[in-house]
Amino acid sequence: MEPFAFIIGLLLLGVLLQRTDAPVDLAKSLNFFVIYVSLPATILLQVPKIHMDMSALGVVLIPWLLLPITVAIVMVMTKNHPPEVRAALLLVLPLGNTSFVGIPIVQTLLGDAAIPYVLMYDQFGTFLILSLYGSAVLARYETGHIHKRLILKKLFLFPPFLMLLVAMIWGEMPSRMIPYLQILSATLVPVALVSVGYSLRIRGGIDYPLFTKALMVKLMVMPLIAFGILFAMGTEPLALKTAVLESGMPSMITAGALAIAAGFAPALSAALVGYGIIIALVTLPIIAYLLERL
């Protein structure tokens, strides 16, 4: 319980910082540090530990297999709603907070051995989906045009993705570098969680029936489907548990921010991100408990 209490404490610290005279762009600065320093260091340390087998492949495939399922559910859920509501859910529901929230929670619930699988799910799954699919949704509903060259440029200039390629090609880092990478990697959890807490905003005035259905899909239905797929594939236990937990992460803050900036149902988008994080602190330990009993 102590590690989980620490996670909640860091989130609350971020929330409390909202009430101080902290710089307006504090969350942006913290995110920048995580993306350019903490996460690349973690990737260089952890990814070489992955053995590419069917279990690792299953972890990578799950977010891509869940994507069309989620899109189909959203299309049905929003058939009587305006296009901006559909666009918001198409952005916010498929994309989970699989790094900033996912890494510390999975580390707490499953241990350090699960982190390589988290990084595989996050970088080859969530990040690529955000870059390719997320950009396409924004373009389709905001401008009507998809800029393929810009999408690819963002993809290959993203530091964590570049370090993922380096780690897979290079393998284990030189021993003299490891202590320094460990120091930088250790900043990921506290900085990321404080940033999430500082960014947490909850708005009223939402369509509660739709909000409830969307939250159930994100936090309950997706993990259940992921479990069914991975179980059928015969995925080894740690990889299965990691991918199921990652599939049940709350909506990505970046996806919510993009939806809000584009004017896609801002109140609904913010509520799914904000309340989703709070409720996931309950649902994820329950999912982990059930997985341990299977």
Placement of each model-derived feature along the sequence:
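Alpha-helical transmembrane segments of multi-pass small-molecule/ion transporters
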Residues: 1-294
